[in-house]
Amino acid sequence: MTEQMLDYFIVGAGLGGVAFAEVALQHQKSIFVFAGDKPPSSVAAAGVYNAVILKRFTLVSQAQEQINLLKVFYPEIEKRIQKNIIFDLPTYRRLASVEEQNNFIVASDRPLFQLFLSPKIISDKFKAVISPFGFGLMKQTGYVDTKLLLQSYRNYLQQNGCISAETFNYAELIIHPDFVEYKGQKAKQIIFAEGFQMKHNPFFKDLPLEGAKGELLVIRSENLDVNVLLKAGVFVLPIGNDLYKVGATYNWTDKTNKPTQSAKDELISELKELISCDFEVVEHLAGIRPTVKDRKPLVGRHPFHKNIYLLNGLGTRGVMLAPYLSYKLFDFIESDLPLDSSISIERYYNSITSSNK
């Protein structure tokens, strides 16, 4: 770190922290990132993006805006880190019955869904995929290689002397009226983007971050030969060299990052209902998604400290939300543009205030 006053401290180097760092750098702001010694859940994420919640045939809020943004945002990061990290890939939703075929066609005909769902049922047969009722085509989908993104971005920050692997010690943060100070270094603002580690943050630990453990497998199969993202009971994401990511599980009680045999068995069982060829498991990953009770993000300013901010609650759609929320938070801080009430942490602080009246 330097002796000069920085614009931002950023605590956390997962998708949220890296996205906010990128937004700040795009605006010529000075930053320092505290990465910590625990791997973020983003490393174990599939990094898939799509606009439709298939279980209920609903659109993600601000879906098109988020898709448009990520298609510009991640290529900008690619230029910075000199790596390919974002890949467009159509999604084939396996249909399990005639009723599911009809539901998909009806949904695709609704005006809001026409940009994201195709009305034609795809009967292309992948030899090793069990699909007697065909597939529904989802458009504007793909994935970001989150592991490569986070590793490469961390290397970039390291080369520029603006990241530390140390775990942030909250007790050493000194809060002044117009800046914060940490171990002698000063910054105008501090952004906490710690994912599930927020549960240990004394400034925000009372917010309702629950955390949902997710596990996925990486398999190798020479005979699967699939070049789209398959979605059924599990998703199957081709990542090259006969390798595929398979996921993902949800566990609301286990808050460890350790892979479990039960999740592995569950994923393998689901996979065998989707494909008929041999495969081998080459990797098993686990992480805690930063999920919130109301399924909405946690973004905004601390109610008592005007230079302390939160960027969290990205949940299962971190690849889409990280750029979108980072720009929203940056504009809130720098230009005083209000945050939407659905993402602002004020929705919780206001409810606490109201209940105490």
From Swiss-Prot:
Stored Pfam families: DAO (PF01266)
Cellular component aspect of the GO annotation: cytoplasm; extracellular region; peptidoglycan-based cell wall
Keyword Flavoprotein: yes
UniProt keyword list: Cell wall, Cytoplasm, FAD, Flavoprotein, Oxidoreductase, Secreted
Class of the enzyme per the UniProt entry, highest EC level: oxidoreductase
Catalyzed reactions: a D-alpha-amino acid + O2 + H2O = a 2-oxocarboxylate + H2O2 + NH4(+); D-phenylalanine + O2 + H2O = 3-phenylpyruvate + H2O2 + NH4(+); D-lysine + O2 + H2O = 6-amino-2-oxohexanoate + H2O2 + NH4(+); D-methionine + O2 + H2O = 4-methylsulfanyl-2-oxobutanoate + H2O2 + NH4(+)
Residues where D-serine binds: R289
Cofactor(s) demanded: FAD
Annotated localization: Cytoplasm; Secreted, Cell wall
Residues bound to FAD: A13, G14, S42, G47, R289, G315, G318
Role description: Catalyzes the oxidative deamination of D-amino acids with broad substrate specificity.
Protein name: D-amino-acid oxidase
Organism: Unknown prokaryotic organism
Organism placement in taxonomy: Bacteria, environmental samples
Gene of this entry: dao
